A protein has these predicted regions:
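Conserved alpha/beta core surface patches that mediate binding of polyanionic ligands
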Residues: 1-15
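Short, conserved phosphate-binding/catalytic loop or strand-edge motifs used
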Residues: 13-23
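Glycine-rich anion/phosphate-binding loop at the beta-strand->alpha-helix junction
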Residues: 25-181
Length: 182
């Protein structure tokens, strides 16, 4: 049904006699939600026509694709793009420009991590959704998809020389890998 979308794999999840199939696609440069919906519907209709015993009904999405909402599944498997940003801040730069040290930043990061754990937060990053929203709006994307992209995991490491390594990972968001579950 599309020249841009390619089926990567189909995952199966069972609950009693019910089955959820999660069709995973690559979609080129498109976010691809409409593309994968049409392709998946076509595949499901074909399966139903095959007369598979027990297959009486299918529904597209059924909340397993977790469109426009965060989910642990999308954190682990990625829906859309997975983005990783890394930087090593030199000790001299932190001292001269930021008026702090890698040790002070690392200590604060530990407090922030513990606060995230204590509160039951889903991630340990501060407000990734603000920047993502601005990018989505500027690029004409559906701002409601920010809920999938607002989860961010950060990691900091104090280096032996006083430099500070920092990474931020946004595990899911609109982009060239999309999925639809049924």
């Amino acid at each position: 049904t599309t020249s841009s979308g390619k089926l990567r794999d189909i995952e199966q999840y069972a609950l009693g006699k019910m089955r959820w199939l999660r069709f995973n696609y690559t979609t080129g440069d498109a976010a691809g939600q409409n593309m994968v919906t049409r392709a998946t519907r076509h595949a499901c209709m074909w399966m139903k026509e095959q007369g598979i015993p027990g297959l009486e009904h299918f529904t597209l999405a059924a909340q397993m694709e977790t469109d426009k909402k965060h989910s642990a599944l999308n954190t682990l498997r990625t829906r859309g793009k997975r983005v990783v940003a890394e930087v090593t801040l030199p000790a001299a730069l932190m001292r001269e420009v930021m008026h702090t040290s890698g040790a002070a930043i690392h200590r604060q990061r530990q407090f922030a991590n513990m606060g995230a754990y204590l509160s039951g937060a889903t991630s340990n990053c501060t407000h990734a959704g603000n920047g993502i929203t601005a990018v989505f709006i500027a690029c004409g994307q559906d701002a409601a998809d920010v809920s999938e992209s607002s989860i961010c995991f950060v990691y900091g490491e104090l280096k032996d020389n006083g430099d500070y390594y920092y990474s931020a990972t946004i595990p899911a968001g609109g982009g060239p890998r999309s999925s639809l579950a049924n």
